[in-house]
Amino acid sequence: MHIAVIGAGINGISVAVNLLETLPGVKVTIFTHNVTPNTTGDVAAGLFRPYLVAEGDHRIKKWCRSTYNFLENFIATNPKHHKYGCCYLEVFELDTEPLEKTLFNEIVGNSRFLNEFELKRYPTAKYGLASTSIISEGKKILPYFYEKFKMLGGKIKVMQVKNFDEVQMIHNFPIVINCSGLGSRSLCNDMDIYPVRGQIIRIHAPWIKYSFNKAEHYIIPQSDGVVVLGGTTQENNWNTLPDENDTKNILNGCKTILNGLEECNILSVNVGLRPGRKSVRLEKENRTNFTTGNKYTIIHNYGHGGSGFTLFWGCAKDVGQLVSDILLKAKL
């Protein structure tokens, strides 16, 4: 069976890899307008942490745990995990108000409250939580998945996808998987999905070894001496150009968290549009091609907010199960 995947960000490429790894005889072609290094995921720092998703949705917990287990196994079994920007990272959550443990703390399972002595290092904070999480840098782990996808026989066709039917009829695909992120607003006419603009700054600061977040600001070191400063969470803002006021706000906010940022060189200022939605859409939909009359199934997998690198493998496994169920039913 030949399956089409629309979108080549972290969700699209991980879905494609999982299908090729788990379903013998399946062929996969990805159709996408952008490939790495030009996807939204390439901008992401890649810290494992649920963000801009409905944590009350029971599926989120399952997807988080599945992805965290995948990343732990990736580190344990891949000697080159640092090359692909994947490693453990100590994370400090700081606040002026008491902190409560969240789904993130439950998943990583190693969080502890900072004591009075430790908090003296952060004079603008009264409370803190320390945890060990995992980072999987978008610009490094995406090439890993692309390489693996091609090694498994996958194909990528770069094109602007205007509708599902045009993709389906290319090879009369019985299944089309929609991982188009924000593109689903037009592809599905889904007005529940909207942009959440995120602006970040990359600086050279190899002395920063831990991640910090306080209110809307965060500091996330990468594996090559680069540190990501953020951020913005601007709903329904389609501007993909850096904003000088946002840059100033990010720098000023991060300076209140950690001393010594004043002299760091700014390497780049980047903007990405996260696919915001009240809940992730992961479900199947039966369709009939308007032009050919052929029936096919769309599996939707989009609306991951700021948690693409936190949910991707759990969602990929669920998509894989839906595909497996369809294949099994077709044999009956």
Curated annotation (Swiss-Prot):
InterPro entries: D-amino_acid_oxidase_CS (IPR006181), DAO (IPR023209), FAD-dep_OxRdtase (IPR006076). SUPFAM superfamilies: FAD-linked reductases, C-terminal domain, Nucleotide-binding domain. GO terms for molecular function: D-amino-acid oxidase activity; FAD binding; glycine oxidase activity. PROSITE patterns: DAO (PS00677). It catalyses: a D-alpha-amino acid + O2 + H2O = a 2-oxocarboxylate + H2O2 + NH4(+); D-alanine + O2 + H2O = pyruvate + H2O2 + NH4(+); D-arginine + O2 + H2O = 5-guanidino-2-oxopentanoate + H2O2 + NH4(+); D-asparagine + O2 + H2O = 2-oxosuccinamate + H2O2 + NH4(+). D-serine binds at Y218, R274, G306. Keywords: Developmental protein, FAD, Flavoprotein, Oxidoreductase, Peroxisome. FAD binds at residues 8-10, 39-40, 45-47, 161, 180, 274, 305-306, 308, 310. Catalyzes the oxidative deamination of D-amino acids with broad substrate specificity. Could be responsible for the degradation of diet-derived D-alanine in the intestine. Maintains the asexual state of worms and represses early ovarian development. Following sexual induction, the enzyme is required for differentiation of oogonia into oocytes in the developing ovaries. Belongs to the DAMOX/DASOX family. This is D-amino acid oxidase. It comes from Dugesia ryukyuensis (Freshwater planarian flatworm).
